[in-house]
Structure formats: C-alpha cells, structure tokens
Amino acid sequence: MLSRTVSSLSRVAPQTLGAVNAASSRQYSITAPRPPTELNQKLKVTIIPGDGVGPELIYTVQDIVKQTGIPIEFEEIFLSEVHYTRSSSIENAVESIGRNNNVALKGAIEESAVLHTEGELQGLNMRLRRSLDLFANVVHIKTLDGIKTRHGKQLDFVIVREQTEGEYSSLEHELVPGVIECLKISTRTKAERIAKFAFDYATKTGRKKVTAVHKANIMKLGDGLFLRTCEGVAKQYPKIQFESMIIDNTCMQLVSKPEQFDVMVMPNLYGNIIDNLAAGLVGGAGVVPGQSVGRDFVIFEPGSRHSFQEAMGRSIANPTAMILCAANMLNHLHLDAWGNSLRQAVADVVKEGKVRTRDLGGYATTVDFADAVIDKFRI
C-alpha cells in the first residue's frame, strides 16, 4: 500500500488527519512540522505505552525505529489507571505532546471502575481527549491481503466518531439509593463539527457517500439534533451521497453487507461499538489502526482500544495495528518515504503469511512479527 499526502482540508482547517484509503494511504498534514532539513536531524514525538500489551506494542515500534534508522526520537509518558500511583498527570502528558510536534503514539489505557479521586468520573482517556480537544476518532476498516475473513469480501470504509460528548460526558449521579441517572449531552456545535469533518474527509479522499448513524427514532431530541445537523451539512456537499441509518440496523448491515459503507459518521457511544464490530470483519483488534484528531493535535492509536490485560508479558499480541499507526504518524510528520516503506513492509509480511500471531491462526510472537517487518523494510 503506497501513500500520498493531501496538504489541505478546507472546511475543518487547521485539521490534522492520517488515514489509509482505497489502495493507498492518504494523509492530511496541516499542523505537522516541517520535514527534517539536516541529514541527522530527528523529530521528537511522545509515546504513551498504556496498560496491558500496550507497552509491548510500543516497544516493538521503538525497536523497528532503531533497527531501520527511522529519524524519530521518543519521549515516554506513563499514564495508567491500573497503576494509578505511578501514573504521570494529564498536564504532563499534554505538555509533552505540545513540545513534541503535537503528536503522540499511544497504547490502550485500561479504564478503571474505581474512583481514584472523589467525584472524578472521567477516566484518563476522556481527560486526555478533552484536554487536547481530540474531537474526531478516525478508524479505517480495510481488508489486508493475506488475512482470511469469514465473509471473504474486500472492505474499505472509514468510521468517523465524535468523541468529546454524548454518553461519555461523565455526568452521573444517584437520585435515591439504587437509582442512577446518567446524562447524554448533544450539542449542535459539536454535531456540525464532526459532520463537516466527515464530509470534508470524503471529499478530499475521493469517497462517494457519508452515512450518519443514529437512534433518533427513540432519542428524538438528542439524536434527532445530530441527524438534523448532519442533514443540514449534507446540503453543502451536493457531490457526496448522504444517507442515514439507525444504529441497530447498521450493526445488522455491517454483518450482512459491509461493502455498502464508505464513510460513516456517528455520536460517541455508537462509534465505540461500531469500531470494534467492524474491526472484527477484517481480522480483529490487532490489525486496524486509528487516530484521534483535534485542531492542533493528533494521537495515533489502534482503532480498537483494548489493553488485552490477559496477554500482558506473553508476547502474543499482534502488533500490526500499532506499526501501521506508526507508519501513519511518519506520513503526518512528512517522513513519507519512511512511512510508505514501513507500511509496505507490514503488507508484505501479512500477505506472505509465514509469520502469523495467534489471533491470525499462527504461533509467532509479537517480537517475531516485528523482526519480520524489519527484514522486509526497504527504503
């Protein structure tokens, strides 16, 4: 899979987005730094290993960078709710990302059911997204040659998820003992922002259709606002086909006829569910990259955010998604030759099929896969 850079995003500027599309990887680069001008110059980025297998996957990328000479330096910030007393603060993480080209590579942070701070319902993931205003989560669902799927179809669609409001607003309270009220926040401003983002994405990447996913038949005000806003934005893009679909029907359609989708846009909770369902269509959590995008910052992280705690330390996790995240990050940083070469090396290893992790029916370790990618890497 080759990559090319699209340097502007007219209606959502200054946006930053890296995503693969069709047979190539297409990359938006608005707030990214200039490429290195000196031979030995390296660009710095923040890494957040996270919990579970996150550190193993991040360290795999670090080893690939070291062995291949990719001109990147990492500053590590440890964020964890599992090891809360050892965790750095959100403020430190934000400062690190800000001084390191506004970019981070991140593993999954396990959400704890325990309140570490009295009255604080937001987990580290939500606090980080809100601190950086990472309003759009973008996950590209694409069939990789060499991975056998149950449906046998070539899929290529993108999920755009609003991730700063909705059910993730952390507004919960106990009315009386045994009765909990949880509030869902929906605003026209954020619905319009994510809708425009999705339509701009479709326009810039040559896609033909945007599907708004909702439950307005039941949540007539909240999801009704989202749907009406998407319908209004769609009128500004007459060349892009628009349709709406109820979330429960969407799940059925994804399982029965997933090839019908192109760009999907949806509120927060639905996006979380659909991301994971769709990842299962193309090989699972280990093969789908994603990114969280804001006006000034971008965090590259696997599209299916599972810490996989039970596999921690066993070197059995599939690093494909994390390595592809790193490739997208390199394109974002204008290191296109490096990003393209890394992505191609992953594609070659997966297609060849000699080195497969357990989730894909093989016995290779996380390190085995990374070593195979290094062997295939050419620049």
UniProtKB/Swiss-Prot annotation:
- Give the record's family classification: Belongs to the isocitrate and isopropylmalate dehydrogenases family.
Binding positions (NAD(+)): 44-72
Q: Where in the cell is it found?
A: Mitochondrion
Tree of life domain: Eukaryota
Catalysed reaction(s) here are:
D-threo-isocitrate + NAD(+) = 2-oxoglutarate + CO2 + NADH
Note the Gene3D superfamilies from the entry.
Answer: Isopropylmalate Dehydrogenase (3.40.718.10)
One Pfam entry name: Iso_dh
Q: Where are the transmembrane segments?
A: none
Q: Which cofactor does it need?
A: Mg(2+); Mn(2+)
Query: Which protein are we looking at?
Result: Probable isocitrate dehydrogenase [NAD] subunit beta, mitochondrial
Instruction: Specify the enzyme's EC class, one word.
Output: oxidoreductase
The UniProt site entry described as Critical for catalysis is assigned to 168, 215
Please tell me where Mg(2+) binds in this chain.
Answer: 248
UniProt subunit comment: Heterooligomer of subunits alpha, beta, and gamma in the apparent ratio of 2:1:1.
Tell me the residue numbers annotated for binding substrate: 129, 161, 248
Molecular function (GO) terms for this protein are: isocitrate dehydrogenase (NAD+) activity; magnesium ion binding; NAD binding
Transit peptide per record:
1-31
Q: Which organism is it from?
A: Caenorhabditis elegans
